[in-house]
Each structure stands twice: as C-alpha cells, then as structure tokens.
Amino acid sequence: MINASLVAMEINNCLPAMEIPRETENYEGFYHLISMSGDVAEAHLNYIIRDHDASLFEAKKATLCHIEKIMNEKWGAGTVQLTITDQYRNMAEIIKKCMFLIENAVKACKNTNIPPLILPIRGGTDGCMLSYMGLPCPNLGTGGHAYHGPYEHITIE
C-alpha cells in the first residue's frame, strides 16, 4: 500500500530546506508551500516558486520535474503527477527598458524630502502581469508586510 500523505511529505523533504521564504531574503528565490491536503489515498501539494533570476527560476521548475521522476521511479509510474502553471515572471526585463518610471518616482520622493527606499518585492503582483501585457507597472510603495501568510496586510495611513 502506498500512503499518499507520506509520499507528499517525502516530496516536500526533497526540496532544499533553506530555500523557503522564512530562510531567504531580498533577491533570493524560494519554494513556498501554500496549501496541502490529503489522506491515505490522495494528496495534493500546492507551491509557488519565486526567483528574480530567470535561469534560477527555470532551475527550480526543473528540480520539481526531477523530484516527480524520482518519486515515480520509486513508487510507480503515475504515482506523482506534477502540473506547473506559469503565473508570474520577474518584471525586471520589462522595467529595465523603461527606467524613466523608476527615475521619476525617485525624483518625486527627493522633491518631497522623502528618501527613496528601493527594495525587492518577493511575490507576484498584478503589475508584473500588466508589464508583460505591454503596460510597464513597477512596484512602487507597496507598504506591505507578512506576504503570503494569513497576516499579509498593507497599512493605509
């Protein structure tokens, strides 16, 4: 008998333990287990993958494909079924062509005596998708905290 919940745990344990949001920062990529469900017969793991570097992002997807292959060799063909859906790509390659947007924002901050603070955004945003649709939308002034968790919020002072 194959216990699907135990196979799911094994899959998660195959991922690099230090490449999770809690253990990474700034431009470091990660695997983020956002939901899981299961029992003896069937289990589901749902991850998001983030990386600012396109080649490292692709490598993370390849790692998941490799884990699927290993698990199916161990437990039998079709035991593990991986679906990868691209939902987010780093918008830097689009924004680099439109740096005047960032320059204008920095200038506006300086004109109002607000020191500009430029930090990486570590999650997917609507602006990313809009940027790839032809409307460059850099992330400006998110003000957010505790992303991807139950206490994610933005202060509206």
Regions found by a protein language model. Name each.
Residues I2-E157:
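Metal-dependent amide/peptide-bond hydrolase catalytic core
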